[in-house]
Amino acid sequence: MSNKIINLGSIEIANDKPFVLFGGMNVLESRDLAMSIAETYAEVTQKLGIPYVFKASFDKANRSSVNSYRGPGMEEGLKIFEEIKKTFNLPLITDVHEPYQCAPVAEVVDIIQLPAFLARQTDLVVAMAKTGAIINVKKPQFLAPHEMRHIITKFNEAGNDEIILCERGSCFGYNNLVVDMLGMDEMKQSGYPVIFDATHALQRPGGRADSAGGRRAQATELARSGMALGLAGLFIEAHPDPDNAKCDGPCALPLHQLENYLKQMKAIDDLVKSFDPIDTSK
């Protein structure tokens, strides 16, 4: 098995390369907040020497309640993304939910994300593939790691092999997620880059009646465990005031802790990738 390298400008995304941070905020709450959060991430990652891609959503189409905040929408969201890219010279990642969104979004962002709940929607997969953009596939909470090969095949047959696989936890009974560390290693055997969404994996789906709960206090422990696997990247969301975030605040890392948090993740990644591989199958 060889590790596939995805080139994003000067950034190399691969399981045996230094990890790439995919980070930002859950949903675009306002232009000013997005700019402020992007600036913090840009400054911290530049200081620590971590390759970085800014993440946010323009629409949260799968909220638990019809009354929950969804975002500014595609048109306004893309304007904010363009300003972030121009101001901070950052590559961007965002998710799409409908086939018609794929082409216009891919004109602005560098990586388009297939949401976990939509990962088997063939029309959406094909529309995403045809953009030629790099694709981040969120592993559905209800699929086994080895079933990701079917989604990969769909993208391949639609003409796109620039694929990243993202672990974000698996259903464990009702209102709970667990992370299968061996499952991430199994996905790595595909050769495609594997990243770990360490904040969404903290969710308790439906845990707050009309929205998801979370376990923010365990954000460091879970991320440390994932980084010990030697992954292509880490996916996190942070907020300056998580308790008042408009989406997934219970899972969000407090923004003021970002630098110390990433220092630890980089130290683990550097250490693990300095080791010679050991083949215990023989």
UniProtKB/Swiss-Prot annotation:
One of its GO terms (molecular function) is 3-deoxy-8-phosphooctulonate synthase activity. GO terms for biological process: keto-3-deoxy-D-manno-octulosonic acid biosynthetic process. It is an enzyme of class 2 (transferase). Keywords: Cytoplasm, Lipopolysaccharide biosynthesis, Transferase. GO terms for cellular component: cytoplasm. It catalyses: D-arabinose 5-phosphate + phosphoenolpyruvate + H2O = 3-deoxy-alpha-D-manno-2-octulosonate-8-phosphate + phosphate. Coiled coil: none annotated. Its EC number is 2.5.1.55. It comes from the Bacteria. Gene3D superfamilies: Aldolase class I. It is found in: Cytoplasm. Pathway: Carbohydrate biosynthesis; 3-deoxy-D-manno-octulosonate biosynthesis; 3-deoxy-D-manno-octulosonate from D-ribulose 5-phosphate: step 2/3; Bacterial outer membrane biogenesis; lipopolysaccharide biosynthesis. Belongs to the KdsA family. NCBIfam families: KDO8P_synth (TIGR01362), PRK05198.1 (NF003543), PRK12457.1 (NF009109). HAMAP family: KDO8P_synth. PANTHER family: PHOSPHO-2-DEHYDRO-3-DEOXYHEPTONATE ALDOLASE (PTHR21057). This is 2-dehydro-3-deoxyphosphooctonate aldolase. The lineage of its organism: Bacteria, Pseudomonadati, Pseudomonadota, Gammaproteobacteria, Alteromonadales. The gene is kdsA.
